[in-house]
Amino acid sequence: KKHTVKGRRYSSCNTQTTAGFLSESSRRKKVFMNPNMTPLPPGYTHVQHTFEPVFDEHSRILILGSFPSVKSRENQFYYGHPQNRFWKLMAQLLEVPVPQSIDEKKTMLLTHGLWDVITSCDIKGSSDSSIKNAVPADISRILKAANIQTIIANGGTAFRLYRRYCEPVTGRPAALCPSTSPANAAFSLERLSECWSKF
């Protein structure tokens, strides 16, 4: 499977780097208006990323998704959809049991920092392809605090968004790995492991 980014093609296993509570009125504004006070298209919601990145000074790899899904936003943590293979994949690669609680997930991943490229956007449900008016996360705060050796984008959307919004600021390319999303059904857990294990 190939991903096309600005006229270039990358294989899904490519290791090349290029890489508070709201009042009723404010809730209505959040749903129907973006920060520029322009009406949102039907089905869209303006959403703010509400949970912090996972990393410490020992983190060496930074894994970036695009933006939390509806289920992740409900659970207030990354990759909350039960069919997303991310946590199973990480446990397999690190040869540890699959973490169940948020604390277990954080502990497992401290050597591998975790965040998303986008901190707010207009989005329809969980659809990455519907993202509009994206505001990028300040990836530099992690790069300044930890000696990150490799930045990995979890899927093509995260990769494209990183190249567009973050790479010009950080000066650091990202490597593209195939998405762990259930939407990427072409990749079994075994195929994902084969690609991700390169890092």
For each feature predicted by the language model, list its residue ranges:
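Short, low-complexity intrinsically disordered segments enriched in A/P/G/S/L with frequent Arg
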Residues: 8, 25-26
